[in-house]
């Protein structure tokens, strides 16, 4: 498994709405994530800084990257644009984090 972590932002007035939209995520999005090899996906909110920290274990970079081209992912990104900064293609603005420590 490949461990990934990344950081995103959430609008200051949208913390509750962001959480509401993820509890639960759309069933079809869950199916796509799992069928593309995503496991143990978690997102954490830092309310003081309006930051979201995400971790996910993936089976391959290729399968993970393929999620972005699915219809359900495209619809999800568009759905989330009013609660978080987005790129021109509606994907969330995010930065990958470098792992500096891991205790198995």
Swiss-Prot record:
Q: In which pathway does it act?
A: Carbohydrate metabolism; L-rhamnose metabolism
Keyword Cytoplasm attached: yes
Cellular localisation? Cytoplasm
What EC number(s) are associated with this protein in UniProt?
5.1.3.32
Q: Which domain of life is it from?
A: Bacteria
Write down the Gene3D superfamilies for this protein, in alphabetical order.
3.30.70.100
**Does the entry feature the keyword Ion transport, yes or no?**
no
In the record, biological process GO terms are: rhamnose catabolic process
Task: Report one GO cellular component.
Answer: cytoplasm
Q: Keywords for this entry?
A: Carbohydrate metabolism, Cytoplasm, Isomerase, Rhamnose metabolism
Q: Which reaction does it catalyse?
A: alpha-L-rhamnose = beta-L-rhamnose
Q: Which residues form the active site?
A: 22
A single MF term (Gene Ontology): L-rhamnose mutarotase activity
- Residues binding substrate: 18, 41, 76-77
The family database entries (Pfam families) matched by this protein are listed as: rhaM
Q: What does this protein do?
A: Involved in the anomeric conversion of L-rhamnose.
Family of the protein in this entry: Belongs to the rhamnose mutarotase family.
Q: How does it assemble?
A: Homodimer.
- List the protein's name: L-rhamnose mutarotase
Task: Tell me what organism the protein belongs to.
Answer: Escherichia fergusonii (strain ATCC 35469 / DSM 13698 / CCUG 18766 / IAM 14443 / JCM 21226 / LMG 7866 / NBRC 102419 / NCTC 12128 / CDC 0568-73)
* The gene coding this protein: rhaM
């Amino acid at each position: 498994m490949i461990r990934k972590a990344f950081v995103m932002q959430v609008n200051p007035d949208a913390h509750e709405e962001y959480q509401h939209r993820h509890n639960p995520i759309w069933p079809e999005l869950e199916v796509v994530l799992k069928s593309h090899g995503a496991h143990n996906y978690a997102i954490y909110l830092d309310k003081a800084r309006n930051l979201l920290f995400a971790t996910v274990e993936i089976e391959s970079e290729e399968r993970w990257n393929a999620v972005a081209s699915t219809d359900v992912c495209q619809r999800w990104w568009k759905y989330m644009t009013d609660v978080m900064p987005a790129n021109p293609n509606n994907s969330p603005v995010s930065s990958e984090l470098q792992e500096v420590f891991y205790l198995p």
